[in-house]
Amino acid sequence: MSLKSEHRVNTSALQKIAADMSNLIDNLDTRELHFEGEEVEFDTSPGDPKAQEKYIPFSSIYNTQGFKEPNIQTYLSGCPIKAQVLEVERFTSTTRVPSINLYTIELTHGEFTWQVKRKFKHFQEFHRELLKYKAFIRIPIPTKRHTFRRQNVKEEPREMPSLPRSSENTIQEEQFFGRRKQLEDYLTKILKMPMYRNYHATTEFLDVSQLSFIHDLGPKGLEGMIMKRSGGHRIPGLNCCGQGRACYRWSKRWLIVKDSFLLYMKPDSGAIAFVLLVDKEFRIKVGRKETETKYGLRIDNLSRTLILKCNSYRHARWWGGAIEEFIQKHGSDFLKDHRFGSYAAVHENMLAKWYVNAKGYFEDIANAMEEAAEEIFITDWWLSPEIFLKRPVVEGNRWRLDCILKRKAQQGVRIFIMLYKEVELALGINSEYSKRTLMRLHPNIKVMRHPDHVSSSVYLWAHHEKLVIIDQSVAFVGGIDLAYGRWDDNEHRLTDVGSVKRVTSGLSMGSLAAATMESMESLSLKDNHRSHKNEPILKSVDDVDPKLKGVGKPRKFSKFSLYRQLHRRHLHNSDSVSSIDSASNTGSIRSVQTGVGELHGETRFWHGKDYCNFVFKDWVQLDKPFADFIDRYSTPRIPWHDIGSVLHGKAARDVARHFIQRWNFTKIMKPKYRSLSYPFLLPKSQSTAHELRYQVPGAVPAKVQLLRSAADWSAGIKHHEESIHSAYINVIENSKHYIYIENQFFISCADDKVVFNKVGDAIAQRILKAHREGQRYRVYIVIPRLPGFEGDISTGGGNALQAIMHFNYRTMCRGENSILGQLKPELGNQWINYISFCGLRTHAELEGNLVTELIYVHSKLLIADDNTVIIGSANINDRSMLGKRDSEMAVIVQDTETVPSIMDGKEYQAGCFAQGLRLQCFRLVLGYLSDPSEDLQDPVSDKFFKEIWVSTAARNATIYDKVFRCLPNDEVHNLMQLRDFISKPILAKDDPIRAEEELRKIRGFLVQFPFYFLSEENLLPSVGTKEAIVPMEVWT
């Protein structure tokens, strides 16, 4: 038999079946279908393990199926549905139009209660659908779906309850109660019969779906089938498809309204096709004028205008009113204008914790990931899959980031990662390698990169947030990427030639250390499907292939490049081991306080690419993570000083909401992510935020609000948000005693031509106010002594470095717009009593050579009055603060729990969170972590400010200048003086013994910032250089 003839036979057979079924339905008499069978309460037997499940897991949002599939889970297992007809609305009739009765039905299923409105004709249509289904089930159609249905209903009674046959027109008002009772009984009986309760016509009649009864999605809202119009998205750049009003199509979708968002699904596949978040621009409008559609309903938010089409104007009004009423009742916080213009509300009694440096931050992230049950969200400016989150490495690869993520993905956790897609000519962070490495670990790991530079026309700005979110309940927020070079502790070690292995009594662990490194390297090679058997793991600087893309050689600087001079004189011989035991041949001057016990052996803290000096040489060959690219015996690493935080509950929900908004926007914007393999994400309800499965130890309750910098290009929102900028200015203006700032950049003081953020102006005005009122007021500012280019620009040129220096100095002390330029006309030299500018530096010894290096301050921290803290990813510059440029995330924490303290010599109630963080920072930079002899309680007193802070910074800077002749230096005002300065002998080389004696006087890391370095030179890029071509906004 040919294929064509076989097709004709099959078609003919199906037509006969359809005809027989039609005849069967026509002959049915509903009067004979009274309910006589035994009622069935539940669709699971007592032995069924699902009978014990009283909830649907949140992870089921990723496994939705077509609405007509027979085995989908819509209802809570073992939980009945109760129906009650509450009221009947009767619309007045005319001689031509009969009366219409509208029944309000309240349904209860477990913790969920909702209402539907139905006319009697809807009951009749529903009844006919069930009759068709009952007849259809009898026909033995040989399909998998149909066979499954027949097997499931074989043991069930076939009888159905009867529906009242009398017309609605004949019902008098006094008979409404009887009619209500009849319909109520009808629904109750239908819902006790699994055969009919699980049928798709029943779920549609009840307005329920697979997402209706998920606990973490909050209360059940309005649902139903609608027609929606395509387009309406706000996509910036060149992608304008769907924006025109004439180019659209209508599609049938299932709409679901939740407390903080609404979504629609495709009925055929069950796929979530769009998610619209409730925000302060959320509006609902009805009518042809607003929608250009008959019976139209328009829903607006910051990201989209969604047009729906209803059956009638009355239906559209009811939908609009019901949605608005539900959102006002359950999600009113999202509709309000919040403090500082933030998208997020202020939350009381939220658990929060701070971190100084990445050691504790990474460890808590690793522990939280290990507890993840449903989702892990990560977004970073840079992410290195092979970094270790717990160090020293004493458990093999267990705590390596990629291994953690793979392990959790295998356990069923969904992992979503967003990476900044860099301009490859400008940055060498190789996000493509990170994405490729992570994606092939497991199908449950999804990675997106954004932006696409051509289609979005975004070349200058970056996604700069650093977030890790666990189950939308625990959120890590700060300035620390999960990337190479970030891990550090309070020691700020300069070198790591082989240091860490825990020694227990009588047991050497050399073999364990060797096995650890061997397994780590072998796993990496195996995971990446490549072999490097003939390649050495340790490479010197000169061993790296200079032809490789992304800077294969040490950076080249101009003739008088600052770093060139610095490295030529000091760094080529510099390295140290600050964690080796005193019995080792080469020791550090610093005491060994590792926090991990007494350490011996050859295992390292920083493996391969993690050992870095990004000023001396950029990262190369990131696809070889455990191959050194810097000779750690001649070049010290740059220590990394940073701040992070962790939040719980509603605050964590807000962080997740920002991530979800960005993820869903990227999915819509980039065609490659529109497939079902990249799902839309849904925010969990604030109503369940207090149910914490896991809590990070050491967190304290406080008042918390999330802040961000976001715009159309980064988050797809109509109006940009600069709540971080607003919060900084507000906190500074309202501070009463002091502010403490740590930041990677300090570019401010608006002239409304080149620089626009007003953080520096707020500082200057607050100091002037204190002076006029005769108040004692202090400002502490800690920034890197030299720019490191780690974040935004990595060209490696001296011109770029000097351009950043220009804007830093322009903010601090050079020009009339600078802070000192605003203070000196009124204060003269008295400004020194109010404000201090410092950096951080450390030193070590290796191979008999004394070496020094700056500590790179990457923090984004503001503390005020020991009661308010802002921690985040935002630098003090226009890129981070203005909202329209880099995307950022921060949190403002205000203490509600206090401890007795001293402020300005008087008793004071200091916040637990803020004071604890301030004291940790002070003890670290001043060298009092292990020495409680000095009282640091009062940050305002003259004794502390002058005799401890200023004195320590000046003494340390003087000693470093004397021993190493460090750059930058106040003796160097121009390039001629620079030549002379670098030609003079260095004490560290000429007389190491005397130099070592001087270095013993160093306390902590704090050093004064040099104001007059190259003050007679124009540090802006010269005309004709490539840096001069770059728009000025890149530097600011």
Swiss-Prot record:
PH domain mapped to chain residues: 219-328
InterPro entries: PH-like_dom_sf, PH_domain, PLD-like_dom, PLipase_D/transphosphatidylase, PLipase_D_euk, PLipase_D_fam, PX_dom, PX_dom_sf
Residues recorded as bearing Phosphoserine in the entry: S499, S561, S591
Catalytically driven reaction(s): a 1,2-diacyl-sn-glycero-3-phosphocholine + H2O = a 1,2-diacyl-sn-glycero-3-phosphate + choline + H(+)
GO terms of molecular function: phosphatidylinositol binding; phospholipase D activity
Compartmental location: Cytoplasm, Perinuclear region; Endoplasmic reticulum membrane; Golgi apparatus membrane; Late endosome membrane
GO biological process terms on file: intracellular signal transduction; phosphatidic acid biosynthetic process; phospholipid catabolic process; regulation of microvillus assembly; regulation of vesicle-mediated transport
Bilayer topology term: Lipid-anchor
GO CC annotations on file: endoplasmic reticulum membrane; Golgi membrane; late endosome membrane; perinuclear region of cytoplasm
Main localisation: cytoplasm
Residues annotated as domain PX: 81-212
Lipid-binding residues (covalent, S-palmitoyl cysteine): C240, C241
Annotated spans, Catalytic: 463-890
Domain PLD phosphodiesterase: 459-486, 853-880
Domain of life the protein comes from: Eukaryota
Activity: how regulated: Stimulated by phosphatidylinositol 4,5-bisphosphate and phosphatidylinositol 3,4,5-trisphosphate, activated by the phosphokinase C-alpha, by the ADP-ribosylation factor-1 (ARF-1), and to a lesser extent by GTP-binding proteins: RHO A, RAC-1 and CDC42.
EC number: 3.1.4.4
Assigned keywords, A-Z: Cytoplasm, Endoplasmic reticulum, Endosome, Golgi apparatus, Hydrolase, Lipid degradation, Lipid metabolism, Lipoprotein, Membrane, Palmitate, Phosphoprotein, Repeat
Keyword Repeat: yes
Function: Implicated as a critical step in numerous cellular pathways, including signal transduction, membrane trafficking, and the regulation of mitosis. May be involved in the regulation of perinuclear intravesicular membrane traffic.
Family: Belongs to the phospholipase D family.
Subunit details: Interacts with PIP5K1B.
Protein name: Phospholipase D1
